[in-house]
UniProtKB/Swiss-Prot annotation:
Residues 245-390 form the Helicase C-terminal domain. Gene3D superfamilies: P-loop containing nucleotide triphosphate hydrolases. It catalyses: ATP + H2O = ADP + phosphate + H(+). This is ATP-dependent RNA helicase RhlB. PANTHER family: ATP-DEPENDENT RNA HELICASE RHLB (PTHR47959:SF10), ATP-DEPENDENT RNA HELICASE RHLE-RELATED (PTHR47959). Component of the RNA degradosome, which is a multiprotein complex involved in RNA processing and mRNA degradation. The lineage of its organism: Bacteria, Pseudomonadati, Pseudomonadota, Gammaproteobacteria, Vibrionales. It comes from Aliivibrio fischeri (strain MJ11).
Length: 432
């Protein structure tokens, strides 16, 4: 039987509160994805869960639905102040925290529960003002949440529901001490509903679950394969001298509607951005030190189609809901095998097809065996003709001289680049 990304389970048949159903209907959510169909009955019965599912499977909606429903069906603690949150949702990055908040908007509107954001990179006072107006659900990153706690603006004494999203990423980013700090200041695990979600349920993630949860049930949705079957994978072995020219040649051959290019370092991302921007592509840059407001604007432009290509470090690879990405380019093979899956999982989502093109260059080809062992298959290899690569490419822009990019001419047509002509290129020879 062929698996699909939607089940026959209706949200309306799960016994959810009418206000929650209204919020789901407002966004067109009628039937559950597999992780929702498995997790929600467990959570609605009051049982903690440690859920495992790939990015893009609907786990965010699963824990939001359970959280809002739990607060509607559970009386608020006696003596609670409006600045004492009843639920807390922790995410590894501010982008993911913002995305979770945006996904919750229809439930906020339909239930009347108040939510607030807490993350670094934005004015402390602005977030504080929202919290002081009352907060039922606090969504954010651990560092800023702890800042508010230490300043006395919030406490965790009235917490009735907890979500830890992307738990494995929390470990990778070194946030485990912050997580334990917050957990240890909450009511006992038996007095709250606890939800942990992770792409992998490694030993350290399971250890965290059993330390701070009440006998969580494991809910696992295994994919047919670690990389989506709708994603066409392709691998090249370029020399370091050919990498950038090969990337630009492939972009003009593939002409992706919406692409993400991943590199392993901020410096490399800036270099790739500079070459593509000079060639008049509509390209955005997303790295860890880009100011928060600018990051939000870049993501919005990419989502709305005003930017065609996003060059990013792994900060964009986990948790963000960026629809209709047609291509993912691994300019550098990631150092961690799991990150390969998370990167290419940006495409081929919600039943759509996608394309993943990876470079095994002189520097990062050493990572390929571990990646192929992890995904349990070899990535199909393709050759390229070095003499057919684009040569008349403009010098890269420097980041501080970033101009306004426009990838369309006055007639509204997309431009092919900044060259007087393009060299004819031979078709690639794909090997199985």
């Amino acid at each position: 039987m062929k698996k699909t990304h939607i089940t026959e389970q209706n949200f309306a048949d799960l016994g959810l509160q009418p206000q929650v159903i209204d919020g789901l209907n407002a966004k067109g959510f009628i039937k559950c994805t597999p992780i929702q169909a498995k997790a929600l009955p467990v959570l609605l019965a009051g049982q903690d869960i440690a859920g495992q599912a790939q990015t893009g499977t609907g786990k965010t909606l699963a824990f939001l639905t359970a959280t809002f429903n739990h607060l509607l069906t559970t009386p608020a603690p006696e003596g609670r102040k409006i600045t004492q949150p009843r639920a807390i949702i922790m995410a590894p990055t501010r982008e993911l925290a913002i995305q979770i908040f945006n996904d919750a908007e229809s439930l906020i509107a339909s239930t009347g529960l108040k939510a607030a954001l807490a993350y670094g990179g934005e004015r402390y006072e602005k977030q504080q003002q929202v919290i002081e107006q009352g907060v039922d659900i606090l969504i954010g990153t651990t560092g800023r949440i702890i800042d508010f706690y230490k300043q006395g603006h919030i406490d965790f004494k009235m917490i009735q529901a907890v979500v830890l999203d992307e738990a494995d990423r929390m470990f990778d980013l070194g946030f485990i001490k912050d997580i334990r700090f917050i957990f240890r200041r909450m009511p006992a695990p038996t007095e709250r509903l606890n939800m942990l979600f992770s792409a992998t349920l490694s030993y350290r993630v399971q250890e965290l679950a059993f330390e701070h949860m009440q006998e969580p049930e494991h809910v696992v949705v295994e994919p047919e394969q670690k990389t989506g079957h709708r994603i066409k994978e392709e691998l090249f072995y370029p020399s370091n001298d050919h990498k950038m020219a090969l990337l630009q040649t492939l972009i003009e051959e593939e002409w992706p509607d919406r692409a993400i290019i991943f590199a392993n370092t901020k410096h490399k991302c800036e270099s790739v951005w500079g070459h593509l921007a000079a060639d008049k592509h509509r390209v955005g840059l997303l790295t860890g030190d880009v100011p928060q407001k600018k990051r939000e604007r870049i993501l919005e432009e990419f989502t709305q189609g005003n930017v065609d290509i996003l060059v990013a470090t792994d900060v964009a690879a986990r948790g963000l809901h960026i629809p209709q990405v047609t291509h993912v380019f691994n300019f550098d093979l990631p150092n961690e095998a799991e990150d390969y899956v998370h990167r290419i999982g940006r495409t081929g989502r919600a039943g759509a097809s996608g394309n993943s093109i990876s470079f095994a260059c002189e520097e990062y080809a050493i990572n390929l065996p571990a990646i192929e062992e992890y995904i349990e298959h070899s990535i199909p290899q393709s050759d390229y003709d070095a003499s057919a690569l684009l040569e008349d490419l403009p010098a890269p822009l420097r980041l501080q001289r970033r101009p306004q990019q426009n990838r369309r001419n006055n007639n509204g047509q997309r431009q092919g680049g900044n060259r007087k002509h393009s060299r004819p290129r031979q078709p690639r020879n794909t090997q199985s």
